[in-house]
Amino acid sequence: ASNAGYYPGAVPMSIKILFDPENGKLLGAQIVGFNGVDKRIEMLEQVIQRGGTVYDLTELEHAYAPPYSSAKDPVNMAGFVAENILKGKSKIIQWRELAELPADTIRIDVRTRDEHKLGSIPGFINIPVDELREHLDELPKDKLIVVSCAVGLRGYLAYRILVQNGFKN
Protein backbone atom coordinates (compact mmCIF):
# COMPACT_ATOMS: atom_id res chain seq x y z
CA ALA A 1 0.00 0.00 0.00
CA SER A 2 1.03 3.59 -0.49
CA ASN A 3 0.83 4.06 3.27
CA ALA A 4 0.17 1.88 6.32
CA GLY A 5 -2.76 -0.42 5.49
CA TYR A 6 -4.75 0.61 8.56
CA TYR A 7 -4.32 4.29 7.75
CA PRO A 8 -7.27 6.08 6.06
CA GLY A 9 -6.83 6.35 2.31
CA ALA A 10 -4.46 3.39 1.93
CA VAL A 11 -4.61 2.02 -1.61
CA PRO A 12 -3.01 -1.12 -3.03
CA MET A 13 0.28 -1.03 -4.89
CA SER A 14 1.49 -3.90 -7.07
CA ILE A 15 5.19 -4.47 -7.64
CA LYS A 16 6.65 -6.87 -10.17
CA ILE A 17 10.36 -7.54 -10.03
CA LEU A 18 12.48 -9.57 -12.42
CA PHE A 19 15.55 -11.28 -11.04
CA ASP A 20 18.13 -13.87 -11.96
CA PRO A 21 17.08 -17.19 -10.37
CA GLU A 22 20.73 -18.20 -9.97
CA ASN A 23 21.99 -15.30 -7.87
CA GLY A 24 19.01 -13.02 -7.19
CA LYS A 25 20.42 -10.12 -9.23
CA LEU A 26 17.66 -7.58 -9.77
CA LEU A 27 17.06 -7.12 -13.50
CA GLY A 28 13.94 -4.99 -13.74
CA ALA A 29 10.79 -3.77 -12.02
CA GLN A 30 7.30 -2.46 -12.69
CA ILE A 31 4.89 -0.82 -10.26
CA VAL A 32 1.18 -0.14 -10.59
CA GLY A 33 -0.48 2.10 -8.03
CA PHE A 34 -1.09 5.68 -7.05
CA ASN A 35 0.71 7.57 -4.30
CA GLY A 36 4.36 6.75 -3.73
CA VAL A 37 4.94 4.77 -6.93
CA ASP A 38 7.67 7.19 -8.00
CA LYS A 39 9.51 6.80 -4.68
CA ARG A 40 9.45 3.00 -4.91
CA ILE A 41 10.54 2.77 -8.55
CA GLU A 42 13.47 5.07 -7.74
CA MET A 43 14.46 2.79 -4.84
CA LEU A 44 14.41 -0.20 -7.20
CA GLU A 45 16.26 1.72 -9.91
CA GLN A 46 19.09 2.51 -7.49
CA VAL A 47 19.48 -1.18 -6.59
CA ILE A 48 19.48 -2.15 -10.28
CA GLN A 49 22.03 0.55 -11.16
CA ARG A 50 24.54 -0.72 -8.62
CA GLY A 51 24.04 -4.37 -9.65
CA GLY A 52 22.16 -5.25 -6.48
CA THR A 53 20.08 -8.30 -5.67
CA VAL A 54 16.67 -9.08 -4.23
CA TYR A 55 18.46 -9.61 -0.91
CA ASP A 56 19.37 -5.91 -0.97
CA LEU A 57 15.65 -5.08 -1.20
CA THR A 58 15.01 -6.76 2.14
CA GLU A 59 17.62 -4.53 3.80
CA LEU A 60 16.61 -1.16 2.34
CA GLU A 61 15.94 1.50 4.95
CA HIS A 62 13.47 4.28 4.31
CA ALA A 63 11.73 7.08 6.16
CA TYR A 64 8.68 5.72 7.97
CA ALA A 65 5.49 7.45 9.04
CA PRO A 66 2.06 5.77 8.69
CA PRO A 67 0.60 8.48 6.45
CA TYR A 68 3.36 7.90 3.89
CA SER A 69 4.58 4.32 4.18
CA SER A 70 4.23 1.07 6.08
CA ALA A 71 6.86 -0.20 8.52
CA LYS A 72 7.92 -2.75 5.93
CA ASP A 73 7.80 -0.94 2.62
CA PRO A 74 6.30 -2.65 -0.46
CA VAL A 75 9.84 -2.75 -1.91
CA ASN A 76 11.03 -4.67 1.18
CA MET A 77 8.07 -7.03 0.80
CA ALA A 78 8.92 -7.70 -2.86
CA GLY A 79 12.43 -8.61 -1.71
CA PHE A 80 11.08 -10.97 0.97
CA VAL A 81 8.86 -12.75 -1.55
CA ALA A 82 11.76 -13.16 -4.00
CA GLU A 83 14.05 -14.36 -1.20
CA ASN A 84 11.46 -16.99 -0.18
CA ILE A 85 11.33 -18.22 -3.77
CA LEU A 86 15.12 -18.34 -4.16
CA LYS A 87 15.63 -20.12 -0.84
CA GLY A 88 12.88 -22.66 -1.58
CA LYS A 89 10.63 -21.44 1.22
CA SER A 90 7.78 -21.11 -1.25
CA LYS A 91 7.03 -22.46 -4.69
CA ILE A 92 5.13 -20.49 -7.27
CA ILE A 93 3.48 -21.14 -10.59
CA GLN A 94 2.29 -18.65 -13.16
CA TRP A 95 -1.36 -18.44 -14.20
CA ARG A 96 -0.48 -19.67 -17.68
CA GLU A 97 0.87 -22.91 -16.16
CA LEU A 98 -2.50 -23.90 -14.67
CA ALA A 99 -3.63 -25.57 -17.91
CA GLU A 100 -0.48 -27.75 -17.91
CA LEU A 101 -1.06 -29.21 -14.44
CA PRO A 102 -1.99 -32.89 -14.09
CA ALA A 103 -5.76 -33.48 -14.18
CA ASP A 104 -5.78 -34.81 -10.61
CA THR A 105 -4.18 -31.65 -9.15
CA ILE A 106 -6.06 -30.35 -6.11
CA ARG A 107 -6.80 -26.66 -6.69
CA ILE A 108 -7.73 -24.58 -3.63
CA ASP A 109 -8.91 -20.97 -3.50
CA VAL A 110 -8.03 -19.80 0.02
CA ARG A 111 -9.93 -16.50 -0.13
CA THR A 112 -13.01 -15.91 2.01
CA ARG A 113 -16.34 -17.39 0.94
CA ASP A 114 -17.65 -13.92 0.03
CA GLU A 115 -14.63 -13.26 -2.19
CA HIS A 116 -15.02 -16.68 -3.83
CA LYS A 117 -18.69 -15.95 -4.62
CA LEU A 118 -17.64 -12.85 -6.57
CA GLY A 119 -15.71 -15.05 -9.00
CA SER A 120 -13.08 -17.72 -9.03
CA ILE A 121 -10.71 -19.65 -11.25
CA PRO A 122 -12.56 -22.61 -12.80
CA GLY A 123 -11.79 -25.88 -11.03
CA PHE A 124 -10.72 -24.32 -7.72
CA ILE A 125 -12.55 -25.35 -4.56
CA ASN A 126 -12.96 -22.81 -1.78
CA ILE A 127 -11.33 -23.55 1.57
CA PRO A 128 -10.63 -20.22 3.30
CA VAL A 129 -7.12 -20.10 4.76
CA ASP A 130 -8.57 -19.62 8.26
CA GLU A 131 -10.35 -23.00 7.89
CA LEU A 132 -7.57 -24.91 6.10
CA ARG A 133 -6.27 -26.68 9.21
CA GLU A 134 -9.76 -28.12 9.81
CA HIS A 135 -9.71 -29.73 6.33
CA LEU A 136 -6.17 -31.14 6.20
CA ASP A 137 -7.34 -34.72 6.73
CA GLU A 138 -9.55 -34.39 3.62
CA LEU A 139 -6.61 -33.53 1.35
CA PRO A 140 -4.48 -36.28 -0.22
CA LYS A 141 -0.79 -35.95 0.57
CA ASP A 142 0.22 -37.80 -2.60
CA LYS A 143 -1.35 -35.30 -5.03
CA LEU A 144 -0.10 -31.96 -6.28
CA ILE A 145 -1.89 -29.11 -4.48
CA VAL A 146 -2.08 -25.58 -5.87
CA VAL A 147 -3.38 -22.70 -3.75
CA SER A 148 -4.59 -19.33 -4.95
CA CYS A 149 -5.73 -16.10 -3.30
CA ALA A 150 -6.32 -12.48 -4.24
CA VAL A 151 -2.87 -10.99 -3.59
CA GLY A 152 -0.42 -13.65 -2.43
CA LEU A 153 -0.23 -13.43 1.35
CA ARG A 154 -3.00 -15.94 2.09
CA GLY A 155 -1.67 -18.26 -0.61
CA TYR A 156 1.74 -18.15 1.05
CA LEU A 157 0.20 -18.80 4.48
CA ALA A 158 -1.79 -21.75 3.08
CA TYR A 159 1.37 -23.12 1.45
CA ARG A 160 3.24 -22.92 4.77
CA ILE A 161 0.36 -24.63 6.61
CA LEU A 162 0.41 -27.47 4.08
CA VAL A 163 4.20 -27.89 4.17
CA GLN A 164 4.29 -27.82 7.97
CA ASN A 165 1.68 -30.58 8.01
CA GLY A 166 3.60 -32.96 5.78
CA PHE A 167 2.34 -32.05 2.33
CA LYS A 168 5.27 -32.26 -0.09
CA ASN A 169 3.64 -31.32 -3.41
Model-predicted regions and their roles:
Residues 106-111:
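Short hydrophobic beta-strand that contains or immediately precedes a catalytic carboxylate
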Residues 90-101:
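A short, well-structured juxtamembrane/interface segment
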Residues 101, 116-123, 137-139, 164:
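Short loop/helix-cap segments at secondary-structure boundaries that form the rim of catalytic
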Residues 44-45, 98, 145:
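Generic hydrophobic alpha-helical segments
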Residues 23, 112, 131:
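Short, glycine/acidic-enriched loop or turn micro-motifs at the edges of active sites
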Residues 1-88:
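Flexible, glycine-rich terminal cap/loop adjacent to redox cofactors
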Residues 133-169:
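Catalytic cysteine-centered active loop of the rhodanese-like fold, especially the PTP/DSP P-loop
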Residues 127-128:
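Short acidic-hydrophobic, aromatic-tinged amphipathic segments that line or gate anion-handling sites
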